[in-house]
């Protein structure tokens, strides 16, 4: 079996052809996060700690997903870094904006350049962009995605049932998400969130 970039592209193409055969035409992948610590929550899901190598993997993955006839979703903008798991609580990202410019944005820029039609925004509170709201609910973070990175595709939230946004009522989170600039909302809590 092929390894490295060729292996990644071949496996990604195969997996996404299987998704399409099942009627699934959007894949919540690839993970574009740069994680430098093997003990971090996102590390096992990321392509690693080097922004340049992660960007190469993201480009290959987006191309293979597209070649399979499936739409790729770049996640978790603006970059997860070494933050805590937002499935189980609030994650505060205290890194300076320059870190995002020099590292975290690069895989997203590569994925956008490769033609990914979707970007998923995380629930991390990224203090250098908006110290009050999770990224998914923050107009400032969405402005960075649209204006600084030039993304003109579809923006979606991470799952609004995650603990990182539980301090908001279901309907409040949905409204804030739309007002922030999300085009689509994800929720796994259908009974409570769909009426919003």
Task: Go through the PLM ranges and name each one.
Residues 49, 53-196:
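Second-shell residues forming the walls of enzyme active-site clefts
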């Amino acid at each position: 079996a092929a390894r490295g970039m060729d292996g990644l592209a071949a496996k990604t193409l195969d997996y996404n052809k299987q998704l399409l055969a099942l009627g699934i035409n959007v894949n919540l992948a690839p993970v574009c996060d740069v994680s430098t610590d093997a003990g971090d929550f996102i590390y096992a899901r990321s392509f690693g700690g080097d922004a340049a190598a992660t960007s190469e993997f993201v480009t290959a993955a987006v191309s293979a997903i597209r070649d399979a006839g499936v739409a790729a979703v770049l996640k978790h903008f603006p970059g997860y870094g070494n933050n805590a798991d937002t499935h189980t609580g609030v994650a505060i990202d205290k890194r300076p904006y320059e870190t995002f410019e020099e590292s975290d944005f690069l895989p997203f820029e590569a994925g956008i350049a490769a033609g990914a039609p979707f970007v998923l925004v995380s629930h991390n509170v990224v203090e250098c962009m908006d110290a009050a709201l999770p990224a998914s609910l923050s107009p400032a973070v969405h402005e960075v995605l649209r204006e600084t990175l030039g993304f003109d595709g579809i923006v979606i939230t991470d799952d609004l049932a995650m603990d990182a946004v539980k301090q908001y009522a279901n309907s409040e989170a949905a409204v804030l998400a739309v007002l922030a600039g999300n085009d689509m909302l994800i929720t796994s809590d259908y009974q409570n969130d769909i009426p919003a």
